[in-house]
Amino acid sequence: MIISSASDYREAARRRVPPFMFHYADGGSYAEQTLARNVSDLENIALRQRVLKDMSELDTSIELFGEKLSMPTILAPVGACGMYARRGEVQAAQAADNKGVPFTLSTVSICPIEEVAPAIKRPMWFQLYVLKDRGFMKNALERAKAAGCSTLVFTVDMPTPGARYRDMHSGMSGPYKEIRRVLQGFTHPFWAYDVGIKGKPHTLGNVSTYMGRQIGLDDYIGWLTENFDPSISWKDLEWIREFWEGPMVIKGILDPEDAKDAVRFGADGIVVSNHGGRQLDGVLSSARALPPIADAVKGDIKIIADSGIRNGLDIVRMLALGADATMLGRAFVYALGAEGRQGVENMLDIFKKEMHVAMTLTSNRTIADIKPEALVDLSKL
């Protein structure tokens, strides 16, 4: 099929990847209301077109935590990326590296830290959950430091997993999931050969290394559910702040008071995020939550936003709402599932071109120029 926009990659991935993996990325929790609002709330924000400005010199690059980024985005941590393309985390990291943006490796990646880090030139970011097994957390931090990871992304919005009903229907979980996955493999032969056979082992690399035994996809949900810690508080993170010397970003902030707590805690950044609508359904979209958070802490801490970003225009919208940078999750997973590394590189090129158009026609030469004035206040019309 012809790929002309990032949204085309979703359809391409739907065709190539078996349903249990496609819907794992595509779906949200409960009735998926927040998942839908993440996208629609961004789509409904009108950009303010300005013309007859000299836009011949336009720059999409930023500096974040001492790193130069070619555009204000980071590939977000996504679990089990190695099930979308052969050794998928390596391919996605190489694509990000080639395009000048960071890649964030998930705690529950297929490829372990030690496989991904040597495959790229720039330091990757590493994401960690708060888990009951503090020994695993310390081990993961030590390995991330040894591999040269530059920034720690600490996900705090999963003290308990959300109810993802779509996974029950697709075969990711639910009755007869093993046989359903096998049957889906027969109907997706290219994926079955490229990923299912040549992409082995299909284990959670970071977890398996620590446990000394293979933790596979069938154990994935169970291991996470068993190890999520609903008792966590800011105090539990203090030892991590002392242990981790590099930049630390708290992911999963939706309330201004929590953002202020992150500043008091000493975090270097936050990610305004509802986990892509995969945790608590019915919460605010990130686009709605972002402006009051920016009002509360802008300038005191770096603000990254994710959830619902589907094109380069959405990146500009998030920046105008108060973000310093953005994270892309589903968008890159669709591209990875469709075309591997080349797909992710092409997707990033598309996003950058779309940003160029949006910045040119809103008369913003640099990322720092993008302010709330780049948006139309529809309440006054």
Curated annotation (Swiss-Prot):
Instruction: Give the bilayer topology.
Output: Peripheral membrane protein
Q: Which reaction does it catalyse?
A: (S)-lactate + A = pyruvate + AH2
Of the GO CC terms on this record, one is:
plasma membrane
Q: What is the annotated role of this protein in its UniProt record?
A: Catalyzes the conversion of L-lactate to pyruvate. Is coupled to the respiratory chain.
Domain (FMN hydroxy acid dehydrogenase) spans 1-380
Q: Which CDD domains match?
A: alpha_hydroxyacid_oxid_FMN
* Domain of life of the native organism: Bacteria
Cofactor(s), names only, from the UniProt record: FMN
In terms of Pfam families, this protein maps to:
FMN_dh (PF01070)
Q: What residues does FMN bind to? A: 106, 127, 155, 251, 306-330
- Cell compartment(s), UniProt: Cell inner membrane
From the UniProt record, which GO molecular function terms apply?
Answer: FMN binding; L-lactate dehydrogenase activity
The record's listing under Gene3D superfamilies reads:
Aldolase class I
User: What's the name of the protein?
Assistant: L-lactate dehydrogenase
The EC designation for this entry is: 1.1.-.-
| NCBIfam families, sorted | L_lactate_LldD, PRK11197.1
Origin species: Haemophilus influenzae (strain ATCC 51907 / DSM 11121 / KW20 / Rd)
Question: GO biological process annotations for this chain's record?
Answer: aerobic respiration; lactate metabolic process
- The keyword Membrane belongs to this UniProt entry's keyword annotation: yes
The record, for SUPFAM superfamilies, names: FMN-linked oxidoreductases
